[in-house]
Amino acid sequence: MMTRVRRLQRPCRPFRPFGPLLLCAASTLSVASAAAYPTMAPFARYAISDRAAEIALARSAAPPSISDHARVLVLGKRGYETAAKGNNGFVCLVARSWDQGIDNPEFWNPKIRSPECFNAAGARSVLPRYLERTRWVLAGKTMAEMRARTKRLAPEPGSVCYMMSRHGYLNDAVGSWYAHVMFFGPDMEPAQWGANLPGSPVMADSAAYSPTTIFMVVVQKWSDGTRNRSM
């Protein structure tokens, strides 16, 4: 159940998942972050050696009523692999640092673990961009090559991503941030939906992801049922 946040005091600007997969890039990130993560670390630092632990972390992105029946992907040396089959159309995974924008200073941060669960529409039209970028990263493509290959396509109507894990680590500035749900729509002015306005519970980013607008709504509880902290 979504909550109406009283006075939305954002600790950071709307999260920029690709660069979608969604999420919250802190306004305090700076040249210092870029200096801290100038290049890709060894693959082992991005990997989760315990496969069962990665599956559990991926499922923590959404309530069990959703994630228990979702397909789960885990990171392998060449890309993501199916670790558990699903039957409800949802796909859950733990995104790594390159889920963020190519120019994000934490693009190579090996600490980032972002549990995400996409519904069927999101899994078809939003998730593939991240999976493709993962293959590029693991194949050793340069930033320039990835930037040139990136295609921005409009999301399928109804695309949604759950990010309700209290165990995630989105970046060095915000940690797990807040439990939230993201909605992907066509390019539009956020104010049309009342997003980013004083007192509105809806945050949005459109300029960075044209032709996609990403809406985020903070929810009351983490996926395990514990209460989300107040904003």
Where are these regions (language model features)?
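N-terminal secretory signal peptides that target proteins for export/translocation
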Residues: 1-15
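N-terminal non-cleavable signal-anchor helices
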Residues: 6, 32-33, 94
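Disulfide-bonded cysteine motifs in exported proteins
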Residues: 7-10, 19, 87, 112
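Bacterial N-terminal signal peptides
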Residues: 19-30
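Bacterial Sec-dependent signal peptides at the C-terminal "C-region" and cleavage site
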Residues: 29-38
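Primary mode marks residue(s) on the alpha4-beta5-alpha5 output face of response regulator receiver
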Residues: 37-231
